[in-house]
Amino acid sequence: MLRTLRTSQLARSGFGTPSFGLRFNSVGRAFVFSQTGEPKDVIQVLEYPIEKPLENQVLLKSLGFTINPADINQLEGVYPSVPPKSVQINNEDAAIGGNEGLFQVLDPGAKSGLKKGDWVLPRKTCFGTWRSHALVEADTVVKIDNTDLTKVQATTVSVNPSTAYEMLKDLKEGDWFIQNGGNSGVGRAAIQIGHIRGLKSISVVRDRPDLEVLKKELTDLGATHVITEEEASDKLFSKQIKSWTGGKIKLALNCIGGKSATSIMRQLGAGGSIVTYGGMSKKPLTFPTGPFIFKDITAKGYWLTRWADKHPEEKAKTIENIFKFYREKKFVAPPVNISTLDFSKGNDVVLSEFLDALGKAQKGGGKKQLVQWVEY
């Protein structure tokens, strides 16, 4: 059942409500949840009134937001970080969904340090990007230089490219890495960032009818080799991998788990590391003992949220470096499926359209789901 709500009981730090354009209307909209469970059952659309910013606040409009696996996990209640419940609806605490998005300044407070028209990104995670407008403290966002940037590039920079950039930062020119999920958002970003930095890569993908098309697409992005999961797990094919790399793969990036993770771990050279940043298969990690003893392999996890919230200034530098790659035409944005929400339509229609995008995100398929509001 679709749920639409209206409220005037708002936390000033959480909501602001200008029109979507540069003029002011009466309401903004947000996708919120007050309990966890099946995403389509817990998401509600909230309509909220306009408030003017105080001197240290800023009024924002959304230029787009994404739906990432972490967002879905937060709705399901299986993610360690959760957005704050900063608004009351029907006497229940509710949180705004979304961690990644791009905003534009509509009305800057006198001491905000921002100006009308500026593009900004959330400084930390759990910002609540799934809303048309936001009234926030100015120090919770970071201004970006939007010169030669598209909205898609800026909207999608904070999660996948930043994750890839940080996981590869300790490798040196000429080093090898191997990754599963080579067609994923992080995988594509890692291929490109690695290529820019002079790294060599092997990307593992699932077999499919258009495999050769995908292989060409990824090698055009900069992948040194693209192989299938079956090849990665084949002990005979491991000899081919060793002939390419000299047995000196330093890093394995794992976003799948299960047998796929085991396969790429086996390809590591002495002193190599496998870093797990996701678990799409929902299968546990099972590694043989030998490589850990005789090849001094290490295994660890990487969680962008922890790093980004602990080091927001470093995160800002990482994002600016990725923007530099975009401006130099060295980096390509991930494939996206853009869903548009028409602000002139009723709440039931808007919620239905959002749930359709959410369903596509849950199914996966290689394209990031990006949502934009239609201006009017």
Swiss-Prot record:
Catalysis: reaction(s): a 2,3-saturated acyl-[ACP] + NADP(+) = a (2E)-enoyl-[ACP] + NADPH + H(+)
GO cellular component: mitochondrial matrix; mitochondrion
Subcellular location field: Mitochondrion matrix
Alphabetical UniProt keywords: Fatty acid biosynthesis, Fatty acid metabolism, Lipid biosynthesis, Lipid metabolism, Mitochondrion, NADP, Oxidoreductase, Transit peptide
Entries under InterPro entries matching the protein: ADH-like_C, GroES-like_sf, Mito_Enoyl-ACP_Reductase, NAD(P)-bd_dom_sf, PKS_ER
EC number: 1.3.1.104
UniProt GO BP: fatty acid biosynthetic process; fatty acid metabolic process
Enzyme class: oxidoreductase
Record has Lyase as a keyword: no
Transit peptide limits: 1-12
Active site: 79
Top-level taxon of the source organism: Eukaryota
Principal location listed in the UniProt entry: mitochondrion
Binding site for NADP(+): 160, 183-186, 206-208, 277-280, 302-304, 368
GO MF annotation, one: enoyl-[acyl-carrier-protein] reductase (NADPH) activity
Disulfide cysteine pairs (residue numbers): none
Known partners and oligomeric status: Homodimer.
Family according to the record: Belongs to the zinc-containing alcohol dehydrogenase family. Quinone oxidoreductase subfamily.
Functional summary from the UniProt entry: Catalyzes the NADPH-dependent reduction of trans-2-enoyl thioesters in mitochondrial fatty acid synthesis (fatty acid synthesis type II). Fatty acid chain elongation in mitochondria uses acyl carrier protein (ACP) as an acyl group carrier, but the enzyme accepts both ACP and CoA thioesters as substrates in vitro. Required for respiration and the maintenance of the mitochondrial compartment.
Protein name as it appears in the record: Enoyl-[acyl-carrier-protein] reductase, mitochondrial
Organism: Yarrowia lipolytica (strain CLIB 122 / E 150) (Yeast)
